[in-house]
């Protein structure tokens, strides 16, 4: 409790505009809680990143845990936090928000950085891994599980060759008390015991098995599994576990691979990669948490401390130069995070006839909206619709980009299916409509052979356009 009260005391209630000017149009990126903007300290003209959250207990917990960890050189620093009322253009009145001023990270995300280095070597991958591991160790020594370790949350300080990499976004971090029952995950980075915890949790809720006094839980070791996946992708350019069918939920074949730890080191990409690197991956991707390397074991591993040159150029750099590949790995998987989480709080829905929300009341009176009609769209109440629309577009990218188990009619049919869903939720998008027309789309499927990489790249542009449009409302 004292930590929470100390954190509350550190939050300023004066207006942030007294000390900072905010560029509301320049966005550094978009996370699950909205875009990160640029702000400038008036007294020094120094640029910082500004994250804005609704002032709720969950947001205060995120700030508290991040502040606890932020003293480490490989974790993004929090400069200061303001509690102000902010009214965005789409809102009828101001709302209490936390404005988190953080150090500016100019060097970009991990995969973007790798894509810019045509000669990204195994030694560089080892050095990046060591920095990530040091950040994790700091969190774990404080008994904090990050629970969201993925490439998008690993940022470089600047564009210099020796720029440090730093861990950010503590939105799903928790104190590890052995009771982390709510699985939080992105499919390609999810540990097997997270899936087992989810399976048992769902069965208990359904009354299939009695609730155990000592429920199956998962803990900090899941961060280490995620680290193993990130190392694998850094080394070769694709994830160790993937599915023959791509969707926003984890298919059975992918779930089976994760639960059994079934992955390989294909000769084409891995022949020049050291046995030390393969060894650390194997030891991190152990299915049983007790057999997995600890964070100290990672830091002591020969691969992170080798005096060998390890100057072999990795295939990942070449693969990630293709924007469509990066889109496939990052957008179709990691950016699906917000839509794939099982929320910590249970949500109960009121019957429509008793709802007080004026937007929903109006929709009820209007009934089903006619095709191509215009209807009132509220930014917050419409966020779920927008998320679904973006999900469907990301499913198209996943189907286009990820390795296919087989070619031919089945894969073509699957692409047609995911595109039908994407079109259903994005009919108003002119760019998508024009794209489908140019790709010979007849409303049910593509009549000509599709250049999947080109389609993925255009759909990525559609996502960016739709995201920008929704944020400006």
Swiss-Prot record:
* Main localization of the protein described in the UniProt heading: cytoplasm
Where does the UniProt annotation locate this protein?
Cytoplasm; Nucleus
Q: What induces it?
A: Directly regulated by MYC: expression is activated by MYC, suggesting the existence of a feedback regulatory loop.
Residue runs in coiled coils: 409-440
Keyword terms of this UniProt record: ATP-binding, Coiled coil, Cytoplasm, Kinase, Nucleotide-binding, Nucleus, Phosphoprotein, Serine/threonine-protein kinase, Transferase, Tumor suppressor
* PTM-bearing positions, type Phosphothreonine: 182
Entry binding sites for ATP: 28-36, 51
Family statement drawn from the similarity comment of this UniProt entry:
Belongs to the protein kinase superfamily. CAMK Ser/Thr protein kinase family.
Disorder cited: Neurocardiofaciodigital syndrome: An autosomal recessive syndrome characterized by severe developmental delay, variable brain anomalies, congenital heart defects, dysmorphic facial features, and a distinctive type of synpolydactyly with a supernumerary hypoplastic digit between the fourth and fifth digits of the hands and/or feet. Other features include eye abnormalities, hearing impairment, and electroencephalogram anomalies.
**Function as written in the Swiss-Prot or TrEMBL entry:** Tumor suppressor serine/threonine-protein kinase involved in mTORC1 signaling and post-transcriptional regulation. Phosphorylates FOXO3, ERK3/MAPK6, ERK4/MAPK4, HSP27/HSPB1, p53/TP53 and RHEB. Acts as a tumor suppressor by mediating Ras-induced senescence and phosphorylating p53/TP53.
**What is the official name of this protein in its record?**
MAP kinase-activated protein kinase 5
Record lineage = Eukaryota, Metazoa, Chordata, Craniata, Vertebrata
User: Gene name on record?
Assistant: MAPKAPK5
